[in-house]
Regions:
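Conserved catalytic alpha/beta core of Sir2/sirtuin-type deacylases, generalized to analogous enzyme cores
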Residues: 1-4, 10-30, 38-41, 150-272, ...
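Electropositive, gly/pro-rich neighborhoods at or near active sites that engage anionic ligands
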Residues: 33-238
Length: 400
């Protein structure tokens, strides 16, 4: 069986771990857009002149499929630098590690201690990363709060001329991912995500789209070629709402979906819209040109995994999420597709004990979307409230 899954970073972790645990032989094609731009991921994008996708969601997806102990090592972060002296101390620590073979305390004192061979591998990739950044930008990287895994992936990109596809495959090999699991770029062109709230507030980057701590809903997101400059942010923020929308409309970019994604959607036996942060993870991947045409022409089940818990006060409800899946898919095509050909099933949880549970009305769903088969069960993970029970979701999907 061939399965295509639209995914972000963390939202489908338990499902992916269930696939790995069961050692399923199905061909899995995981579609990730890489619009993330927060923290060290955003810094790496900047250091590479925004010629690459955000790497964080790709790494989270890949490592979810791996049982290799090195995964825990790659989760280790460099200490946060809160002032100038701590930055100087960090530079000294890195020098001692690279030149004097003195292992930093944050590595030796970590819960998961790297082996000698792992330390050597980390050192090689760290040197490649910071040396190349200095060579081409004359900038010493501030590694505050950087993940080891991010540095390794950035080094792979440098060694492979920023070829994302090749770097993904090599990182998968490092993580010992099964050969039947393919991680695909949703689009080849690296883009940047911005948005606007219904009250007119600008969301100037992907991080603000994800972390919009407000009860006001997101009205629209836009994918643009270059990140907004400070001058652009100031200018847009000073405009009235309609003028803001007009400005962002002019910046918006449309691009083709990755041909590998289109081929996968065309031949899939199951297409899954995974759970996660909708406006940054799943939905943007649906608006790349060609996606809806391939999904609509395939008669396989198309399954939406509804989120269990609100991440923010303005998080989408289940009914709104279905509407947005259809709306974003519509943007990817000049043809008018019947919604029945775009989504056929939805998985919703009937566990009412989840904190900040996303409320839905089964009868409302049946009235608004009568063609959708609703699969209702307790999909909550008993060990981690608010996350999916990966094995139960997997069983439900494979039994459709």
């Amino acid at each position: 069986m061939k399965i295509s899954i639209f995914s972000g970073g963390r939202g489908n972790k338990n499902l992916f771990q269930a696939f790995a645990k069961e050692q399923c032989e199905h061909e899995l094609n995981i579609i990730v857009n890489g619009l993330d731009d927060g923290a060290s991921t955003g810094d790496i994008r900047r250091l590479m002149d925004y010629k690459i996708h955000g790497i964080s969601d790709f790494l989270k997806t890949i490592t979810a499929f791996s049982n290799d102990p090195f995964i825990d090592v790659m989760e280790i972060r460099f200490p946060k630098n809160s002032n100038f002296l701590e930055k100087i101390k960090m530079i000294s620590t890195i020098y001692q590690f690279l030149e004097q073979n003195i292992t930093p305390e944050f590595l030796t004192n970590s819960k998961t201690k790297p082996t000698e061979s792992q330390l050597k591998f980390i050192k090689e990739n760290l040197l490649t990363f910071i040396e190349n950044v200095y060579k081409f930008r004359e900038e010493i990287v501030d590694l505050s709060d950087y993940k080891i895994g991010n540095i390794i992936f950035a080094s792979l990109l440098i060694n492979n001329n920023l070829d994302f596809k090749v770097s993904i495959k090599k990182f998968c090999k490092i993580c010992n991912i099964q050969s039947n699991v393919n991680i695909l770029e949703a689009a080849k062109l690296p883009l940047n995500l911005v948005g606007i709230l219904k009250n007119g507030t600008l969301l100037p980057n992907e991080a603000s789209v994800v972390l919009s701590r407000t009860t006001d809903l997101i009205q629209r997101t836009y994918q643009i070629n270059n990140p907004l400059s400070l001058n652009q942010i100031r200018k847009i923020s000073s405009l009235e709402k309609n003028d803001k929308i007009q400005y962002l409309n002019a910046l918006e970019t449309t691009t083709d979906s990755n041909i590998e994604v289109l081929n996968s959607l065309e031949c899939s036996d199951l297409i899954i819209y995974g759970s996660g942060t909708p406006y940054s993870s799943t939905l943007p991947s649906l608006e790349y040109l060609g996606v809806a045409d391939k999904i609509a022409s395939n008669n396989c089940p198309k399954i939406l995994i509804a989120n269990l818990q609100k991440e923010t006060d303005n998080f989408l409800g289940t009914s709104s999420l279905i509407e947005d899946v259809i709306k974003f898919l519509t943007k990817s095509s000049t043809l008018k597709h019947d919604p029945k050909d775009l989504i056929t099933h939805i998985l919703v949880s009937n566990n009412n004990e989840i904190e900040n549970k996303i409320v839905f009305d089964i009868q409302e769903l049946k009235i608004k979307f009568p063609w959708i088969t609703i699969i209702e069960d307790d999909f909550n993970d008993p060990n981690i409230k608010g996350t999916h029970n990966g094995s139960k979701v997997l069983d439900s999907i494979l039994n459709i």
